[in-house]
Amino acid sequence: MSRVCQVTGKRPTVGNNRSHARNATRRRFLPNLQTHRFWVESESRFVKLRLSAKGMRIIDKKGIDSVLTDIRARGEKI
């Protein structure tokens, strides 16, 4: 399973670790992904999504039905 938020599309980014001597070694910054189950009243079922903390906030603001419509419009199967 890829480390990509299904709502925002956030994915790992790359950067540097920095030691006290300012030596740079490459590293990955991973998104804060959570697997969360949402009850969808219109479909009378639970939907399991893998999303970031920001994705959860978007669902709180817009509603699960609106977000699912956007995800399906992108062609993702839920």
From Swiss-Prot:
HAMAP family: Ribosomal_bL28. One of its GO terms (cellular component) is ribonucleoprotein complex. It holds the Pfam family Ribosomal_L28. It comes from Alteromonas mediterranea (strain DSM 17117 / CIP 110805 / LMG 28347 / Deep ecotype). Gene3D superfamilies: Ribosomal protein L28/L24 (2.30.170.40). The keyword RNA-binding does not apply. This is Large ribosomal subunit protein bL28. GO terms for biological process: translation. It comes from the Bacteria. The gene is rpmB.
